[in-house]
Amino acid sequence: MFKRTIPLFAAFTLAISPSIFPNYAHAQEDKPKTNQYWWPKMLDLSPLRQPNATSNPMGEKFNYAEEFNSLDLNAVIEDLKKLMTTSQDWWPADYGNYGPLFIRMSWHAAGTYRIYDGRGGANGGFQRFAPQNSWPDNANLDKARRLLWPIKQKYGRKISWADLLVLAGNVAMESMGFKTIGFAGGREDAWEAININWGTEGKWLESKRQDKVGKLEKPLAATVMGLIYVNPEGPNGVPDPLAAAEKIRETFGRMAMNDEETVALIAGGHAFGKTHGAASGKYLGPAPEAAGIEEQGFGWKNSYGSGKGKDTITSGLEGAWTVTPTHWSHNYLQNLFNFNWVKTKSPGGAIQWVPENSNASSMVPDAFDPSKRHAPVMLTTDLALKFDPVYSKIAKRFLDNPKEFDDAFARAWFKLIHRDMGPRSRYLGSLVPKEIMIWQDPVPPVDYKLVDANDIANLKGKILNSGLTTPELVKTAWASASTFRGTDMRGGANGARIRLAPQKDWPANDPQELAKVLKTLESIQNNFNNAQADGKKISLADLIVLGGNAAIEQAAKQAGYDIIVPFTPGRTDATQGMTDVKSFEVLEPKADGFRNYFDKSNNMSPPEMLVDKASLLKLSVPEMTVLVGGMRVLNANTGQNQYGVFTDKPGTLNNDFFINLLSMSTEWKKSSETEGIYEGYDRKTGKLKWKATSVDLIFGANSELRAVAEAYATDDAKDKFIQDFVNAWVKVMTADRFDIKAANANINS
């Protein structure tokens, strides 16, 4: 079931030792039972209702971009640098420097990003809320955020928590001698927790998320419940570096990192700081969400010794990787390859590794006592970089070529903390690097004169007279725009990547039909552009959307309504060279209920996948409902199947879908021939009238969806249906147009 959940994971492999974290049970027996408890198979619509706009205390008119652009970013950076070395008695800084703590905080904020659904990442600042704020892997990051509060308090609405959590780690690296390639603001704060599928385990640090061949279930990225990436002691606590390498490769890959980026991130990240395991985890109190109210949001209260400083317990692992924990160096790679490592246990009982050579026992300074020295440590996941043949080759190259390593780490770090932000057009601030990177899904700038209203009307006429049908035009526009994901702002119609690999070959897009439509539209585009004397052009990306709009206007006219579907030109056409095929493969729809398409490899039901798709498109329950109803009567199903086309006038935009679905003249039965298909029979004659999928019938079966369907099936709802359909359509068509605000339709009956 889709249970208001969504996965995310990452590991600044400062990770967590499962042996030190007790499971805190939450008694539920005395809690009122939810509808989901009583009826667990009930379709959960809550993903379409979060976040709730009324939760935002800043109000609907608040413009974060304007506030951030008025911020003195250099002043914030200077304040952060001062904070780094101003140790507080209530949480003393290791080596007198909070920099490594802030790097871990930033990493764990951004590193929850995952490629398969774009969920996770630093946007929203969700590390402040449950469950992230209480994950075992995020132990003591509550202190890092509290250290930042005076700066957040000083600059207020001009910098979000989401941006500050990332900026702090970036500044920390710069202050400790590493040159980053920049920073972009633009992450807006969330004001409430959202429910995401982090896995189905019922206990922290369990791992029951592998399929039959041992791969992580999609869309999950972390291997263990409550960890960002992987268990640093090795899979299931077994200290096997090669097995750890397999898990690292899988989970970092699901965070959009290749092998080189993975090695750079681990080797670069572990150049700073230390792990903390002064004693057993039995001394730790509950995580923030389970702690007493008097703790005021702090968790993991430590009863061992002073409970802080030298007595800190975080992961259960203990020690630093390098001789310069607060200064950038290449000592991590030097130590990794120069020593033979032997297995040992930390004071907290976690498995880790130290040099076989006893002469290394005094290399590393103590974090608090200048008279003490220690041996460097490595974790099982660190040794993966030495023993995995692919990782080892990369790591040795970095060791021999320090400048190449510096550049690789800077780029991988920038990608890590910006991957969930979408295109560069959303980046804010003076520190944005000028270089365009392929993972940003670039599109060309508009370097030509855009079409005007007369041109648009002329082009719509040519499209409608081209021989292309309403379903073909609607399906093509939908296929192009509906790749958008509001989670990581990827996809959408801009770029016209539907004509490029891999999108042109996706089964959901009816490749043969799509090729025919694109060929016709390209001909119209070329004829128009070649006829212009003033440099005016229309992009194929714009023409695809315009074609869908024109078809909808024609379909509404057939129903007796004259409408103008709002259209704003300005999209451009990306090239294949601007498109990372592998990166775009994860956007392929394995189900699209709006087109009645479903790949049976999915582990969720078709209605659940519809809700997930609508959630990614940032649609509400009514918007999802009206779009499905409209797409059905427009005959826009994949493969030209007729499931759910409850009308005798396909291609006409009307509310027939809802009227016929809710009619008691039809009796529905499961098909005896095709699994997942339902047949609707006339109650009086017994004649077969309709065929449908569970996506179609859910709008009559689910009580909440039925209520919305009824609103569109009433005699006085015809105008409203068309108005709402067009508005929802435009919302999808412009979802990736961060430069405009969607307009509402004009309708005359």
UniProtKB/Swiss-Prot annotation:
InterPro entries membership: Catalase_peroxidase, Haem_peroxidase, Haem_peroxidase_sf, Peroxidases_AS, Peroxidases_heam-ligand_BS
Active site: H108
EC number: 1.11.1.21
Cofactor or coenzyme needed: heme b
GO terms of biological process kind: cellular response to hydrogen peroxide; hydrogen peroxide catabolic process
Cofactor details (free text): Binds 1 heme b (iron(II)-protoporphyrin IX) group per dimer.
SUPFAM superfamilies assigned: Heme-dependent peroxidases (SSF48113)
Assigned keywords, A-Z: Heme, Hydrogen peroxide, Iron, Metal-binding, Oxidoreductase, Peroxidase, Signal
Signal peptide location: 1-27
Catalytic activity: H2O2 + AH2 = A + 2 H2O; 2 H2O2 = O2 + 2 H2O
Covalent cross-link (Tryptophyl-tyrosyl-methioninium (Tyr-Met) (with W-107)), residues: Y229-M255
Residues of the site described as Transition state stabilizer: R104
List of residues binding heme b: H270
CDD domains: catalase_peroxidase_1 (cd00649), catalase_peroxidase_2 (cd08200)
Post-translational modification: Formation of the three residue Trp-Tyr-Met cross-link is important for the catalase, but not the peroxidase activity of the enzyme.
GO cellular component, one term: cytosol
Chain residue numbers at which the record places covalent cross-link Tryptophyl-tyrosyl-methioninium (Trp-Tyr) (with M-255): W107-Y229
Subunit annotation: Homodimer or homotetramer.
HAMAP family named among the record's database cross-references: Catal_peroxid
Family to which the UniProt record says this protein belongs: Belongs to the peroxidase family. Peroxidase/catalase subfamily.
Function: Bifunctional enzyme with both catalase and broad-spectrum peroxidase activity.
Protein name: Catalase-peroxidase 2
Organism: Legionella pneumophila (strain Lens)
Name of the gene this protein is made from: katG2
